[in-house]
Regions:
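Flexible glycine/proline-rich
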Residues: 1-142
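Helix-centric, low-specificity signal for extended rod-like, repetitive segments
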Residues: 12, 159-160
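Hydrophobic alpha-helical signal peptides and transmembrane signal-/tail-anchor segments
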Residues: 143-159
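Short, intrinsically disordered C-terminal tails of secreted or membrane-associated proteins
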Residues: 162-167
Length: 168
């Protein structure tokens, strides 16, 4: 439908969860097409859509810096796509490790409730082994920062407009 009235800028991304996803443009309006699964939508919003909205608004958006965590699981994955695995951060002796939520399906809302964050597995990795380190993004820090920055941006940019409109 978008191709008939506008242009598809991209569709299909080499990520999991988060497929299918598309970005199009109709006249001067961007159209973001999201998958129907809740985990996919939540992660896409936090990691891709939110920064894109900031970019369109001319604001800077900085993703929180990940920390390195060793994984406490073995797993095979397809290469040529990045995967975000929901994990629980646990203390193991003197270090923290990442335990994978058992079911990683993109419809598993419980995986978000159980998890503390996500581990990002790069495209080139096909085997994940216990003890390997990967980038870990903490949900609490990440989502707090996303919503704090959004609210701060809205207050700075909308509050003067609202105040000035009431004076008229």
């Amino acid at each position: 439908v978008i191709n008939r009235i506008g242009k598809i800028l991209f569709w299909k991304a080499a990520i999991k969860p988060g497929r299918p996803v598309a970005l199009g443009k109709v006249d001067n309006c961007y159209v973001i097409c999201l998958p129907g699964n809740p985990v996919s939508v939540q992660l896409l919003y936090a990691l891709i859509i939110q920064p894109f909205i900031y970019y369109l608004a001319g604001a800077n958006f900085v993703l929180p810096q990940p920390e390195k965590l060793k994984v406490n699981f073995n797993m095979n994955k397809k290469t040529k796509r990045m995967e975000w695995l929901r994990v629980k951060k646990k203390k193991n002796n003197l270090e923290f490790i990442a335990d994978k939520f058992p079911k990683q399906g993109s419809g598993m809302i419980s995986s978000i409730a159980y998890s503390d964050g996500i581990i990002e597995i790069p495209e080139h990795v096909s085997k994940i082994k216990i003890g390997e380190s990967y980038d870990y993004f903490d949900f609490k820090i990440f989502f707090f920062l996303v919503f704090f920055l959004l609210n701060l941006y809205l207050i700075i940019n909308l509050f003067p407009v609202l105040v000035n409109s009431k004076k008229s």
